[in-house]
Amino acid sequence: MKQKAKDENVLAQNRQARHDYFIKDTYEAGIALTGTEIKSVRARHVTLRDGYVQIINGSAFLENVHIDEYKEGNRYNHDPLRSRRLLLHKKEIAKLADVKAQKGMTIVPLKVYLKHGFAKVLIGVAQGKKEYDKRETIKKRDQDRELRRKYRI
């Protein structure tokens, strides 16, 4: 049986997160979704840009992630911006709570993908970049692009 490429299962990515934050660590978490939500996710109608993870009473929740209403969902449709529970081990949630308590640290979703038929989200422990850090990153990326262009000819 032919193996699928890993990127083929990626349904949404948060490219802005890598630009705005230094990603220190990543965790894979399951997402508790309703029927119409998983159908919208499979149709790639997910926006992660403004999302973040909040820890409330020992549970992790994905906040401010927009999953469009399912077109065929009629009256059973979901609220596009509702909080969605993340499925993590208690020890992982405790680690994330400790990290989030530190000043300047946050937890952001990086990508949503399917793994063995289940929707998963890759969350990253992140530290915000300053404006000069962003400019430095852009400058380095431009230099790398110029070098590749120069040696390709």
Curated annotation (Swiss-Prot):
Keywords: Cytoplasm, RNA-binding. SUPFAM superfamilies: Small protein B (SmpB). Transmembrane segments: none annotated. It is found in: Cytoplasm. The keyword Ubl conjugation does not apply. InterPro entries: SmpB (IPR023620), SsrA-bd_prot (IPR000037), SsrA-bd_prot_CS (IPR020081). One of its GO terms (molecular function) is RNA binding. Its main location: cytoplasm. One of its GO terms (biological process) is trans-translation. The keyword GTP-binding does not apply. It holds the Pfam family SmpB. One of its GO terms (cellular component) is cytosol. PANTHER family: SSRA-BINDING PROTEIN, TMRNA-BINDING COMPONENT OF TRANS-TRANSLATION TAGGING COMPLEX. Required for rescue of stalled ribosomes mediated by trans-translation. Binds to transfer-messenger RNA (tmRNA), required for stable association of tmRNA with ribosomes. tmRNA and SmpB together mimic tRNA shape, replacing the anticodon stem-loop with SmpB. tmRNA is encoded by the ssrA gene; the 2 termini fold to resemble tRNA(Ala) and it encodes a 'tag peptide', a short internal open reading frame. During trans-translation Ala-aminoacylated tmRNA acts like a tRNA, entering the A-site of stalled ribosomes, displacing the stalled mRNA. Belongs to the SmpB family. This is SsrA-binding protein. It comes from Lactobacillus delbrueckii subsp. bulgaricus (strain ATCC 11842 / DSM 20081 / BCRC 10696 / JCM 1002 / NBRC 13953 / NCIMB 11778 / NCTC 12712 / WDCM 00102 / Lb 14).
